Amino acid sequence: MKKENQAALILEGGGNRGVFTAGVLDYLMEQNTEFSYVTGVSAGACNAVDFVSKQRGRTRQCMILEDKEYSYISMGNMIKNRSLFDMDMLFDRYPNEIFPFDFDTYFQSNTECELVVTNCNTGEAEYLSEKEDRQKLMNICRASSSLPVVSPMVELDGEMYLDGGIADSIPVIHAMKKGYRKNVVILTRNYGYRKEKPGKSKALYVAAFREYPNLLNTLLNRYRNYNRTLDLIEKWEKEGHIFVIRPEMEPVGRAERDEEKLAAFYQHGYDLMKEKITDMETYLKQDNED
């Protein structure tokens, strides 16, 4: 089914590189820009729910912390909870206490929002949505953001899940299969970036996931799938079929904690979207062609 007059927003992950996406989305929220469909992966899932709940500035607050007491990245946490990131802080204390998430606005939104997770048994991507249960929504976000090896698996309805980026890092093809003809893609890497074949990480994956052969296969081939998707994105972008926003400065690292670097990358996203808003609006208004 074609959705001629509707547009999709696709958000890549990348840990704290998601602060770039936060800048892009904060500007879009200032302009009251809405999309019929939003999908996000890993950190992009967190961006996605904040966009649908219309909480301008929330993702920035979560990523650029003024109070170090609420930091969610530490090696101590890796030893204590087998996770580099404090997932309880991120998906329990943040939304319920520290940076309250507006569940009511999110649940009442007409925007369809799907968050990408990877099923550990099948090794395939699943696209989950939740518009009623607060805890389940945050658990889906947690699963979508749970990196292999450095985060434990997350159980949802009896199945085990990990980071959505393992199986589908940039779900633009999924959005197209759902019928969306206008797709705005927010990437967190520069033009021309490609992933390399697993090196030392291969041994870690084999040791950690030998009981999950389908997941292991997806992990070892992730670079191929990711690079193939980027090849298509660059082709479709050149042909005018999709609209892409990506960093034009050096991205920060996945676990970057330097406030100045994070703030600069956030501002870059904001300024870039402001610069390109007219081009995006023109793209969205263009007639669709078969």
Where are these regions (language model features)?
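Patatin-like phospholipase
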Residues: 1-41, 49-290
